[in-house]
C-alpha cells in the first residue's frame, strides 16, 4: 500500500489557470506541453512511449495505478514524459504481474506527477483553448508565480526536432516477439528461421512495434534517426519501416531526404505516426499543428479502401494537410472524429503509412492488419526479383 500522500503540489497553465493537488512522484519542478489521453488502460505503456517527449500527460480515466507496474509493459528503456496529471492514485495494486507501485515507479524514474486534479475540467480547457504549456511544482509553498513564469516561457514544440533526441545512438538487432502469458515471457526466433530482413528507422520506436514485426517473421535492424540511406541499402533490407516519434516532423530534414532516396528504389516502405508524416513530407505534402491532437485508444477511423470502421490507438499533435495533396498520394484512412487524414499510400510506389498506432499497446488491435499488408508488399517484391 502507498504511504500517506501529504506533500502538496500545484499545476499552472500558461493562461494562468491553476490546480492544487498532491505530489505522487519525484520532488521538484517540471514544465512541458500539457495534453490529455483518453485511454482507460495502459498507463505504463503511455508514459514510456517516446512520442510523449517534452509533454505533460493528463490521463482522463479517474483511477490510475490499480495494476501497479512491471518491466514487461515498458515501451522503451526510459520514461520520456515531462510530467503526469491524474485524478486519483490507487493506493493498492492488484495484479499478479505487479512488481512495484506506480508512485514508487514514478519516483524511481524521477518523474514529477500530481494527483487529486479535476481532470475533466482540465481536459475541457485543453479541448476549448488547445494544448497549453504547463508547469507542475512539488512544493509546500505551491509557488504560483514561479510555475506561471516557467509555463509562459516554455519553448513551443513546433519546429523542434525531438526525434533525434529520443532515437537510438547506435545500430542494433531485434529478434524478440510478443509476450506469451502461457510461458510468461517474450518469444524469440532463431535467426536462421526469419523470412525477411526489415530495417527500422528509430524516431522514437515503441517495443511492441518491433515485436509485431518479429511475429510476422521479420529479423530487424534498428538504426538511428540520422542514419545515411546508403548505409541502410548496404544492409540489403527487404523492407523499410519508419517508426513513431515525438513532436514536429518538419525539422527532420535528414529523415525526409533519406525517405526520398528510398523512394527511388523499389523497397517496400511502411510508416506510422511520425513516420507517416515524414513519408507525406517526402512525397510533397504539408504538415499542420492540431488544436489539441489525438491521444487515446478509442479513435474511430474509416478504412476507405475496405469500406469499414476500425477503432484505433492515436498519439500525435500534428497531421497531414489534405489541401493540395500531390497526385501520387491516395488517402486510404480518415478520422471519424474530425475528418483528418489517417492513412495514405503512394500510387507509384510500394509505400504506405498510417497516422495511428496499429501495434496499440495500449489500445485495440483493429489496425494490426496493416503489418500483414506490409509483409504482403515485401513478399510481392521478393517474388518479382526472383523471377
Curated annotation (Swiss-Prot):
The protein's annotated pathway: Amino-acid biosynthesis; L-arginine biosynthesis; carbamoyl phosphate from bicarbonate: step 1/1; Pyrimidine metabolism; UMP biosynthesis via de novo pathway; (S)-dihydroorotate from bicarbonate: step 1/3
Binding site for L-glutamine: 51, 245, 247, 274, 277, 315, 318
Keywords: Amino-acid biosynthesis, Arginine biosynthesis, ATP-binding, Glutamine amidotransferase, Ligase, Nucleotide-binding, Pyrimidine biosynthesis
Reactions it catalyzes: hydrogencarbonate + L-glutamine + 2 ATP + H2O = carbamoyl phosphate + L-glutamate + 2 ADP + phosphate + 2 H(+)
CPSase: region residues: 1-196
Classification via InterPro entries: Anth_synth/Amidotransfase, CarbamoylP_synth_ssu, CarbamoylP_synth_ssu_N, CarbP_synth_ssu_N_sf, Class_I_gatase-like, CPSase_GATase1, GATASE
EC number: 6.3.5.5
UniProt GO molecular function: ATP binding; carbamoyl-phosphate synthase (glutamine-hydrolyzing) activity; glutaminase activity
Entry-linked Gene3D superfamilies: 3.40.50.880, Carbamoyl-phosphate synthase small subunit, N-terminal domain
Residues of the Glutamine amidotransferase type-1 domain: 197-384
Transmembrane segments: none
Enzyme class: ligase
Catalytic residues (positions): 273, 357, 359
One of the GO BP terms on file: 'de novo' UMP biosynthetic process
Assigned protein family: Belongs to the CarA family.
Stated role: Small subunit of the glutamine-dependent carbamoyl phosphate synthetase (CPSase). CPSase catalyzes the formation of carbamoyl phosphate from the ammonia moiety of glutamine, carbonate, and phosphate donated by ATP, constituting the first step of 2 biosynthetic pathways, one leading to arginine and/or urea and the other to pyrimidine nucleotides. The small subunit (glutamine amidotransferase) binds and cleaves glutamine to supply the large subunit with the substrate ammonia.
Subunit and partners: Composed of two chains; the small (or glutamine) chain promotes the hydrolysis of glutamine to ammonia, which is used by the large (or ammonia) chain to synthesize carbamoyl phosphate. Tetramer of heterodimers (alpha,beta)4.
Protein name, entry field: Carbamoyl phosphate synthase small chain
Native source organism of the sequence: Buchnera aphidicola subsp. Acyrthosiphon pisum (strain APS) (Acyrthosiphon pisum symbiotic bacterium)
Amino acid at each position: 500500500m502507498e504511504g500517506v500522500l501529504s506533500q502538496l503540489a500545484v499545476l499552472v497553465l500558461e493562461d494562468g489557470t491553476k490546480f492544487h493537488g498532491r505530489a505522487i512522484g519525484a520532488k521538484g519542478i517540471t514544465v512541458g506541453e500539457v495534453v490529455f489521453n483518453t485511454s482507460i488502460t495502459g498507463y505504463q505503456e503511455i508514459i514510456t512511449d517516446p512520442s510523449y517527449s517534452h509533454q505533460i500527460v493528463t490521463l482522463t480515466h479517474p483511477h490510475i495505478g490499480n495494476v501497479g507496474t512491471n518491466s514487461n509493459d515498458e515501451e522503451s528503456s526510459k520514461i520520456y514524459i515531462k510530467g503526469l496529471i491524474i485524478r486519483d492514485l490507487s493506493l493498492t495494486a492488484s495484479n499478479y504481474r505487479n512488481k512495484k507501485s506506480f508512485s514508487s515507479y514514478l519516483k524511481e524514474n524521477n518523474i514529477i506527477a500530481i494527483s487529486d486534479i479535476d481532470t475533466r475540467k482540465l481536459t475541457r480547457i485543453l479541448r476549448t483553448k488547445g494544448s497549453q504549456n504547463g508547469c507542475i511544482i512539488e512544493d509546500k509553498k505551491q509557488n504560483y508565480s514561479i510555475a506561471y513564469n516557467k509555463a509562459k516561457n516554455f519553448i513551443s514544440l513546433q519546429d523542434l526536432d525531438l526525434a533525434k533526441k529520443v532515437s537510438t545512438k547506435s545500430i542494433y538487432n531485434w529478434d524478440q516477439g510478443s509476450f506469451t502469458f502461457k510461458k510468461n515471457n517474450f518469444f524469440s526466433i532463431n535467426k536462421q528461421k526469419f523470412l525477411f530482413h526489415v530495417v527500422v528507422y528509430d524516431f522514437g520506436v515503441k517495443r511492441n512495434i518491433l515485436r509485431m514485426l518479429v511475429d510476422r517473421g521479420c529479423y530487424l535492424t534498428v538504426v538511428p534517426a540520422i542514419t545515411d540511406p546508403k548505409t541502410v541499402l548496404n544492409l540489403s533490407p527487404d523492407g523499410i519501416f519508419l517508426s513513431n516519434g515525438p513532436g514536429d516532423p518538419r525539422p527532420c530534414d535528414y529523415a525526409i531526404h533519406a525517405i526520398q532516396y528510398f523512394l527511388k528504389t523499389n523497397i517496400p516502405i511502411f510508416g506510422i505516426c511520425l513516420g507517416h508524416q515524414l513519408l507525406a513530407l517526402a512525397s510533397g505534402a504539408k504538415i499542420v499543428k492540431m488544436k489539441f491532437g489525438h491521444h487515446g485508444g478509442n479513435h474511430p477511423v474509416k478504412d476507405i479502401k475496405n469500406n469499414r470502421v476500425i477503432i484505433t490507438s492515436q498519439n500525435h499533435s500534428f497531421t497531414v494537410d489534405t489541401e493540395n495533396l500531390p497526385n501520387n498520394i491516395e488517402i486510404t484512412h480518415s478520422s471519424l472524429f474530425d475528418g483528418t487524414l489517417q492513412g495514405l499510400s503512394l500510387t507509384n510506389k510500394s509505400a504506405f503509412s498510417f497516422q495511428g498506432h496499429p501495434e496499440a499497446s495500449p489500445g485495440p488491435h483493429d489496425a494490426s492488419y496493416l503489418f500483414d499488408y506490409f509483409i504482403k508488399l515485401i513478399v510481392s517484391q521478393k517474388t518479382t526479383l526472383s523471377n
